[in-house]
Amino acid sequence: VEILPIANLLTMCMFGFILCHELAHHNLGHIYEASHKQQELNADTQGFQYLKRVSHQFEQLEFLKIPPNILGAPVIAMIYLQALEAIGIISISGDTHPSVPQRIQNLYEQFNKAADKEARYLYNGLRLSCVEFIDEMNKMKNASC
């Protein structure tokens, strides 16, 4: 497996999900209300549905290439955020956003409904690499203390 093309697709899908998430906030009318945790989960869910729709148009779109087998990318992005939060680099959870584990669970449920065998295989490999990466980050953090 060539890493660079997968990394490129993964990055594009993560970025695409962020855009879809923000579009979902707009379409769900969240921009007119005070932000709260359920809105974020709703925007994650709707944003994933938008991303899935884009992935189903993979063959028709000339430049936007998000194949269905990379739909686990939003979950992987949240796992990255969880790792950064765990070692104290960022803080995401608060009054307006649900915990990262809640968002991972919500997005994983969406992914699991949509994923085929190839998407699950790729997701599992990426998830396991995240686990190794998080372990290494924790070792480096502990070594510097």
What residue spans do the PLM features occupy?
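Long, well-structured alpha-helical subdomains associated
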Residues: 53-145
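Active-site recognition of the HExxH zinc-binding catalytic motif
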Residues: 17-30
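Short, flexible helix-adjacent loops and helix caps
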Residues: 28-35, 56
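Short pre-active-site segment immediately N-terminal to the catalytic Zn-binding motif
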Residues: 1-17, 34
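General structural signal for secondary-structure boundaries
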Residues: 2-6, 36, 42, 97-102
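An active-site-proximal "capping" alpha-helix that borders the catalytic cofactor pocket
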Residues: 36-54
